Amino acid sequence: MPLQDFLKVLDSITTHTNPHDVFVIISGGEPTVREDLETCGKEISRRGYPWGMVCNGLCLTRERLHNLIRSGMRSISISLDGLKDVHNWMRRHPESFDCAVNAIWEITAIPELTFDVITCVTRRSLPQLPAMKELLISLGVKRWRVSTIFPVGRAAE
């Protein structure tokens, strides 16, 4: 969605919504591919809304993370759908798991940022949940959301 359209949508809800009653979440596709994500965040904050995002960690560097926090981001969720083999298969990217784990590692170093990890359980990832739990604990994760996924596409395998 182009920035101007995003701002129009934001303004349309601002006219009848108390910003203190709403928390804006930016999510999928992948928010961090937006070159104007920090601008979006600043505009959300300027209108009085707290905001956060759900991302896969692929494009989330330390510098980008700090820029997003300076833009007003208060929370972030990182998707991690299995251990390396399953997560990379599910995300169709050979570095997806490593990027997600690195993002989680960076995020745990920022105590003022609320964060969690989201796992969509599939047949392939179900046996990995105990090992994932241990991994997440070792990374300092305190909140882990585990959910099922509608079994279509790769999720059905």
Predicted feature descriptions by range:
Residues 155-157:
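Nucleotide-sugar-dependent glycosyltransferase catalytic core
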Residues 3-26, 34-151:
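Radical SAM/AdoMet-radical enzyme domain recognition
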